[in-house]
Amino acid sequence: STAKSTA
């Protein structure tokens, strides 16, 4: 799986 986060 792939997780990406931007804040």
From Swiss-Prot:
Source domain of life: Eukaryota
Note in the entry: On the 2D-gel the determined pI of this unknown protein is: 6.0, its MW is: 30.0 kDa.
Protein's name according to its UniProt entry: Unknown protein from spot 447 of 2D-PAGE of etiolated coleoptile
Native organism taxonomy: Eukaryota, Viridiplantae, Streptophyta, Embryophyta, Tracheophyta
